Amino acid sequence: AVRSGYDMDIIPSDLATYGKDAKALLKELQRDMDTAILLITHNLGVVWEMCDKVMVMYAGNTVEFTDTKTLYSNPRHPYTWGLLDSMPKLSDESKGELKTIPGTPPDLRLTGKCCNFYNRCPYVTEACTQSVPPLVEVEPGHFVACHRQNLTNKLEKGEGLKDE
């Protein structure tokens, strides 16, 4: 039905079926209709295979937005690091245990007044508990919402702040 008459600018999908057939069908529809796919998923492997650009969201807020290659090679938000670190790896010696992000998700009824990730973030500051960080372009086409990005230092994964 989609191919035979609907004019869509975006095809929304949660990719409930992760099989090759679902991915192939979405790619075919995208090509045939010259349109975009809005893919909503927690499966970062699917993101790598299917997406040109990625918007990472946490508790309803965008925390990072960039092209897929940059996200995987230079993630800049602590939540993104946690997501990428939680992906199973062939070289992983965790003996089947997946890494997790410490802490608990926020109460969504109380969001909007601070960074939603502050209680799970190893780099939390007082600013994080006082206001929602703005989405800032930290490199051309790479946007991050983190109070630590507003400093003159570059936040490095797992190493704290480094002087530029």
Language-model segments: which ranges?
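Charged, flexible cofactor/metal-binding loops and thiol motifs
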Residues: 67-164
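Glycoside hydrolase catalytic-domain context in secreted enzymes
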Residues: 1-31, 36
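Gly/Ser/Thr-rich beta-alpha loop segments that engage phosphate groups in nucleotides
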Residues: 7, 47, 105
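P-loop NTP-binding/switch modules centered on Walker-like glycine-rich loops
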Residues: 23, 27-96
